[in-house]
Amino acid sequence: MPVVDIDPDELRRLTGHRSKDDDELRQDLFGLGIEYEGETEDGDFKLEFEADRLDRLSVEGIARSLRYHAGDDRGVDIPDTNAPEWAIDVTDVPADRPYVTGAVIRGVDLDADALDSLIQLQEKLHATMGRKRAKGAIGIHDLAMLKGDTVDGDGTAARSLTYTGIDPDGDTFVPLDDDAERTPADVLTEHPTGETYADLLADHDTYPAIYDDIGLFSFPPVINGRRTEVTTDSRELFVELTGTDQWTIDRMCAIICYALDARGATIEDVTVDYPDRELHRPDFAVRTKHVSHDRIETLLGVEFTTEAVVDLAERAGLDATPTDDGYDVEIPPYRVDVRHPVDVVDDLGRAYDFNDLTPRYPDVNTIGGRTESSRLERSVRQALVGLGFEDLLNFNMTSEAENFDRMRLTPDHDAVGAAQPATIAEPYSQDFTILRTWALPSLAMVLETNTHHAYPQDLAEVGFAAHADGDTQTGVAERRTVAAVLARNDASYEDAKARLQALCDEFAVALETPPTTHPSFIDGRAATIEIDGQPAGVIGELHPGVIVEHDVEVPVAGFEFELDALR
């Protein structure tokens, strides 16, 4: 759970609730689901809150939530933006960090508290949504220190910066907290911040860089140049974000802009010129979620009028437009946590105040117990642990690259794991765009992230896999699967077969393994798993191409089959 340090006096000033004492503030924060964890030596509140409410990573975001909670603000608030005077020209960027966004901030009053809050928000976003800068990184610069080409435009941006890829040993700049000119490669080996984030650019032939007329001033995702350092004297800022996913960096940018808007700053658009399209950023577009009236009443257990729901939505910082069966609810751009209609209902419940809801027992009399399938799954997990495997639980969502490409597989192959995947609508991340069709790729990814640990590594998972199926009500067919890998110097088909045979003996089923071919396994070292005479999965030694793709340093053998075959 994220923890932030908040100055209570600054919180009072931003909310306008100057007369409230610390106890009253703590009570208001508790009403938002924000836990008070104590105070720092300087008297700041240490606050812990839900990991999904990234808009509350700063005092400005918490103040906004308190103002809505108190009824001071209502509905979706979209900041006004001025026409762009700056552009970012995107050319020859590294393929693994192709996206950029930004904003110009004018008229900001950065005293020491405001600057500390901005830096804390930047670093908290890096640690959470930015995945420690791997997915998204923020650079904040003093705009007065930037020099851009001035061109005669037709109402479009007139000053241009360049986001590009450069030679690691090419141009030099003076990084923050330094006084020496260094190349990007030097920064990664000679600067403390560079050493911290060097792994993000390991084995890269080109590094990301942002230039103005003077030269290199930003080396994302590592560090900014000292020339554009932001101080309490800065009144105009340039905010740039780079990353692996446009949606993610756009949402991070929106959170930064809303925080500065709360301090009275003016936001100005930036034109992002990709080779194939032009974007105007920041992106303050609202999203819309439809939620039925019945769902609201069922989940909250309260009967509402249409007018009451619209009022609750406005008090929650949303806007609800009635429809025939419910409401189209507009979501502000900083609310990255609202992904489902249930999230909207949760907001409505908080606006209503959960303390005013009357708990009641369900109108059923049942005696709980494990289902047959749950008992089987538990027994298989215990058996795998007894056979020396580490029991894992991975995400059911993945990407086509992980599920197919890195396993040398395509959806059209006639092989275990090959199937048309169920795709995710409006994916939160390009890392999670489909439901996995098999579990072995998930175990391969775990091996990839644990190459720094000693071998052998014997891993197993009992989980779910799925594929698209138009004949089902949901369009998805789901099944439970058992997968295991053995990573060690002497891993072989025979080792995997021995473990699988022991597992089948435990459940009193007959195992046969006729030879087969599979793109993910070595030819001649793979077999079909037949249990009680029925094909159920595949076993073998992973193909060297798969092993190299995942940077695993030892041979790997593994198997996967359908759990229900053990019934």
Curated annotation (Swiss-Prot):
Mg(2+) binds at residues 337, 343, 346-347. Its main location: cytoplasm. The keyword Mitochondrion does not apply. It is an enzyme of class 6 (ligase). Residues 284-359 form the B5 domain. Its cofactor is Mg(2+). Coiled coil: none annotated. It comes from the Archaea. GO terms for biological process: phenylalanyl-tRNA aminoacylation. GO terms for molecular function: ATP binding; magnesium ion binding; phenylalanine-tRNA ligase activity; RNA binding. Keywords: Aminoacyl-tRNA synthetase, ATP-binding, Cytoplasm, Ligase, Magnesium, Metal-binding, Nucleotide-binding, Protein biosynthesis. It catalyses: tRNA(Phe) + L-phenylalanine + ATP = L-phenylalanyl-tRNA(Phe) + AMP + diphosphate + H(+). It is found in: Cytoplasm. Its EC number is 6.1.1.20. One of its GO terms (cellular component) is phenylalanine-tRNA ligase complex. Tetramer of two alpha and two beta subunits. NCBIfam families: pheT_arch. Belongs to the phenylalanyl-tRNA synthetase beta subunit family. Type 2 subfamily. This is Phenylalanine--tRNA ligase beta subunit.
